[in-house]
Curated annotation (Swiss-Prot):
This is Histone chaperone RTT106. The gene is RTT106. The N-ter domain (residues 1-67) homodimerizes and interacts with H3-H4 independently of acetylation while the double pleckstrin-homology (PH) domain (residues 68-301) binds the 'Lys-56'-containing region of H3. Histones H3 and H4 chaperone involved in the nucleosome formation and heterochromatin silencing. Required for the deposition of H3K56ac-carrying H3-H4 complex onto newly-replicated DNA. Plays a role in the transcriptional regulation of the cell-cycle dependent histone genes by directly recruiting the SWI/SNF and RSC chromatin remodeling complexes to the histone genes in a cell cycle dependent manner. In cooperation with HIR and ASF1, creates a repressive structure at the core histone gene promoter and contributes to their repression outside of S phase. Keywords: Acetylation, Chaperone, Chromosome, DNA-binding, Nucleus, Phosphoprotein, Repeat, Transcription, Transcription regulation, Transposition. Gene3D superfamilies: 2.30.29.120, Pleckstrin-homology domain (PH domain)/Phosphotyrosine-binding domain (PTB), RTT106-like. It comes from Saccharomyces cerevisiae (strain YJM789) (Baker's yeast). GO terms for molecular function: DNA binding; histone binding; nucleosome binding. The keyword Acetylation applies. The keyword Transcription regulation applies. GO terms for biological process: transposition. Residues 319-339, 402-418 have a biased composition (Polar residues).
Length: 455
């Protein structure tokens, strides 16, 4: 058997084959047969036979790759696609006529808007995600290496209507007519994905359901802003997603180096994710109630909290903010959270504390100097706040202000505490008596030195 074919191979490969042949001389014949087979296959490819689809599939190949009922694995009609294009399209899983491999495509009638081949290699990540404040909808999110003709690179995001999807499954005979649990649809779609070579996670599955991979443990989502765009930040077991207004951001959790908190107020704060390559992404207007979940996620993923780093302390000092520089100082965000909790315990934010609400209304009447009170106590408190921002417009009623003020305190549940508050307010103001001319001679009950000053 000739060794001439070795001269046609790369030098490194030729040496490796030579090493094997010296140990096992009979293997030379096998190598030569393999070489000839490869030549024949290459010749067949050039002649157009046995051509296999590549990731960057050409339009000519798609023309021969027809979709029919016989090669369709699964189909959902009228899906709302949000990315990479915004259209109502049909989602189809089918087997290619070219080589029998599974394909995902989005169709408008018979026209392909997007097709993804070689799903086992091309789909990088896929997940079901909840739609905030819309329990009847669910997102299907997918990222991929490339699609046919490389027309798009943005992730695929589509919205599934749970009721419509259930009805389609029943019409296709995939579910019994009495089934109402949408998780049955999710389970079926996930199984089809596994059969076609990739996995769709379901990290927000109901905790009452059996889920052996426990994906739901670290998963939550919250509303925030990135710049001027409002969106949803999803914290998943292995990824963090911000969407779904372009550009959609996808982070591998292992690529996040650290997190910092800033712009902290009593109600909101900002969080910045810093990747290992130094890129920083800031998300603002996050509700204070979300801090505990973010902090737990950060600790589980062993990310660094650099909110109290020396660099940020130096920036705080330059702005005149005091800090003692101790290593074990609790973060300002934790202190803000505790302060908010203490205020809630004290009843500061209690809408049910009618006594405090009434005290506030009485004090508001004094502060604006109007002394006027409507029959509706709840509306009176709101009017008092508005009067603080405007000049008094009804000076012709000055003569009745003192009498109305006295009556206002007697009308609020008759509580001694509020009367005491009025006296405490009035007495120091009696140090300076300002005479007020009253047009009505019948108001003999008005007190001198009422403490109300008019412009």
């Amino acid at each position: 058997m000739s060794k001439l074919f070795l001269d046609e191979l790369p030098e490194s490969l030729s040496r490796k084959i030579g090493t094997v042949v010296r140990v096992l001389p009979s293997s030379l014949e096998i190598f030569e047969e393999l070489y000839k087979y490869a030549l024949n296959e290459n010749s067949n490819d050039r002649s157009g036979r046995h051509k296999k689809p590549r990731i960057d599939v050409s339009s000519d190949l798609l023309k021969t790759d027809e979709i029919s009922e016989t090669n369709t694995i699964f189909k959902l009609e009228g899906v709302s696609v949000l990315s990479p294009l915004r259209k109502k399209l049909d989602l189809v899983f089918y087997l290619s006529n070219v080589d029998g491999s599974p394909v995902i495509t989005l169709l408008k009638g018979n026209d392909r808007e997007l097709s993804i081949y070689q799903l086992n290699k091309n789909i990088k990540m896929a997940s079901f995600l909840p739609v905030p404040e819309k329990p009847n909808l669910i997102y299907l999110f997918m990222t991929y290496t490339s699609c046919e003709d490389n027309k798009f690179s943005e992730p695929v995001v589509m919205t599934l209507n749970k009721e419509n999807t259930l009805n389609q499954f029943k019409n296709l005979g995939l579910l019994d007519s009495n089934v109402t649990d949408f998780e049955k649809c999710v389970e079926y779609i996930r199984k089809q994905a596994i059969l076609t070579g990739f996995k769709i996670s379901n990290p927000f599955v109901n905790s009452t359901l059996v889920d052996t991979d426990a994906e739901k443990i670290n998963s939550f989502h919250l509303q925030c802003h990135r710049g001027t765009k409002e969106g949803t930040l999803y914290f998943l077991p292995d990824h963090i997603i911000f969407g779904f207004k372009k550009p959609i951001l996808l982070f591998d959790a292992s690529d996040i180096e650290s997190i910092t908190y800033s712009s902290i107020t009593r109600l909101t704060f900002n969080a910045s994710l810093v990747t290992k390559d130094g890129e920083k992404y800031e998300f603002s207007m996050i509700d204070q109630t979300e801090y505990a979940k973010i902090d737990d996620y950060v600790k589980r993923k062993q990310m660094k909290d650099k909110s109290m780093s020396e660099e940020l302390k130096a920036k705080s000092k330059s702005k005149g903010q005091a800090t003692d520089g101790t290593a074990d100082q609790p973060s300002i965000l934790q202190e803000a959270t505790r302060q908010m909790q203490d205020e809630k315990k004290a009843g500061v934010f209690s809408d049910d504390d009618e006594e405090n609400d009434q005290n506030f209304e009485a004090e508001s009447d004094l502060s604006d100097g109007s002394g006027q009170e409507s029959s509706d106590g709840a509306e009176d408190g709101e009017e008092a706040e508005e009067d603080d921002e405007e000049d008094d417009e009804e000076e012709d009623k000055k003569g009745q202000s003192a009498l109305n003020r006295d009556n206002s305190f007697a009308s609020i549940n008759g509580q001694p505490e509020q009367e005491l508050q009025y006296k405490e307010f009035k007495e120091p103001l009696e140090l300076e008596d300002i005479p007020i001319e009253i047009g009505n001679d019948d108001d003999e009950d008005d007190e001198d030195g009422s403490g109300v000053e008019y412009d």
